Amino acid sequence: MNYTCTRDNSISISASKAILAGISPDGGLFLPEEFPKVSLNDISKMRSMTYPERAAYIIGLFLTDFTNDELKAYTAAAYSKSRFGEIPAPVIDIGGESILELFHGPTSAFKDFALQLLPYLLTASAKKQGINDKIAILVATSGDTGKAALEGFADVDGTGICVFYPYGGTSEIQRLQMTTQQGKNVLVTAVKGNFDDAQSGVKAIFTDKAYTDELKEMGIRLSSANSINWGRLVPQVAYYFSAYCDMANAGTVKFGDEINIAVPTGNFGNILAAYIAKLCGLPVKRFICASNKNNVLTDFIQSGTYDKNRPFYLTTSPSMDILISSNLERLLYLLSGRNDAEVRGYMAALAKDGKYTVSPGLHRAIAAEFACGFADDTGAAETIRRTFEERRYLADPHTAVAIAVYEEYKRSTGDLTPAVIASTASPFKFSRSVLKALGKDTSGSEFDLIDRLADISGLTIPSRLAGLRDMAERFTGCIEPADMKSFISKGLIK
């Protein structure tokens, strides 16, 4: 299976080349030239598999230059009991909906599913391509990706990683997870501005041919651990198939019937992975795209106009504080009939004017698949309180946004299709916001709050989060977006 580019259909490269490159030189994103087909019979066979086996099966359909034995070894290591516990992606029935818990990995966020596996895929891809260069991983993060990438790549031979996060734009726990990171090949810095400034800076570096050529002469090759990299996205497709198997095994859905999938959405990667699962054969009726107050995606799905020229809000769900949703480009490409010229036009307009309007046909195609809505901080807090009091389920603010939007979707449409809601982070990463939502005391240090939330909820604090209280911060700097390239050159290139 080869991969093409959202902005240039003439490109055709292998999976390992796409993973190594991360992004096309023209700024476009890689997608399979065609999607593998997964029959109900194939899904039925997955029902008795372990999670690592399910993941290896689905990922192997996309990464055809990797052997089945290779992928089984990688997923067994990445999703081991020591990293993810007994059940990496459990589905919890909370009465009315199912919750797909994606926060049981080393950094307590859904990004672990991709970023525990990506180092294996990336280093193996380099070997397959006969490349001995050092691979420098660049990451822009709104909170969770940074720590998950650092955890995945720390001290991996032949790699270095540099993470940029928006100053003041993450939770305190998210920030500490990054600034205390151990490893001889890691760099972290805050960037003045918001996530979009950091992400735009990383994209500009990738498409700066003079700079990337200079690095290649030094034996250094850039790659990405953001969801613009196909190697980040494909592991996420697997957990939607796994969730369906678990729902069928539990009797929550009759095997073969459709489900709805609701996802808290910022950069559009997680919900796009769900849509790709449907393209492959997963029985899905509707996708519910849930935004916070930065509701650029809600407005786009409703109107057909994407406009980032709007106020930027810092919310209690910081991983969704995004106005440029990079993975939306992949959806535009797929639903436009793989029209690369049309996508180039939209992306040029976004770069020039900060907005674009899709064709009526493309807008209809998007609206046919995706429902949408948003919940502000007040709505998310009310959902946290109500869900805990009525269902004894403790949700983090991102998950609460998805629950709130899904409940409103169900009320307004009467759609009673069995639903799964992606829970993307542990509530302990956002203890202050969760305690405030529950009407509890929020005084004291971040670790006082974690302890208090554990007492109130009866839940166990994830060990890696508990361990942060004894770790010293290593990375305390803050730079301007214009200085990102020099920061990389000074720090990562040794």
Regions found by a protein language model. Give the residues of each.
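PLP-dependent amino-acid enzyme catalytic core
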Residues: 1-494
